[in-house]
Amino acid sequence: KIAKIREDFSYALIHDMKTPISSILMGIQILETGKLDTRPEKRAKLFHILKDESEHLLALTEKVLTLSKLENHQLNLFREMLSLRSMLDDLIEKFSAKADKPVHFSLALEAETVVADGEFLKEAISNLIDNAIKYSGASVAIIISSFCKPDGAVVIKVKDNGFGIPLKDQSRIFEKYERASATERSRKGGASGFGLGLNYVFRVAEAHGGTVEVESIEGEYSEFSLSLPQKEFLDSVEEK
């Protein structure tokens, strides 16, 4: 079974890397012909595409390396008090600018601050937003909320109006090689590939001593809840 999992993951990783590599190669071949030498606007647009695809490929390789370190507990987290609203405002600006379809964001933050590693938390939430956009129709509505649990943990929720996840797949979507019903969701306009992003969220939650859960109704919505403990860190600060 382990060998099969590794085989599936390797195949999926190659599949996900193939698209940006193909785009980069095709762009270079077009530039080599010299056809765009007298068309500066199209040439500039192609360079922009090449840059985006190169950054996508680099981000993918970095995510694989980070996942490996998280799995082996080799990554040290730098926990600090963060402004959740400020982090989300940055992400909303980023995704609103690059999305290829209308995306409406709503914030409902009862917890305005959170103790976490800012870099990893931001990337985890970014992955949840990215999935929400990929697996939704022509118009996307995303609600991001937060609140404090009685034990002090901060919960961050990301809810979309997308295609949803079949109940039979929900227990497997955080596995590194899994992307639930990718073929079916692709037919509905979703992304193809595999679920590195959700496994990353799972590993970041785990590294913080927290959890991530999903609630979804196929054809209606998906809501991911990221719970991050706060008490241990805050108690250690008070002791100092």
PLM region descriptions:
Residues 52-57:
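Short alpha-helical segment of the dimerization/phosphotransfer core of two-component systems
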Residues 72-77, 113-116:
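Conserved micro-motifs of the catalytic ATP-binding
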Residues 78-93, 122:
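A conserved beta-strand-to-alpha-helix junction within the catalytic ATP-binding
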Residues 132-133:
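Short helix-loop "hinge" at the ATP-lid/N-box region of the Bergerat-fold HATPase_c
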Residues 139-152:
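Short beta-strand/loop element within the Bergerat-fold HATPase_c
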Residues 165-178, 182:
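Short conserved segment of the HATPase_c
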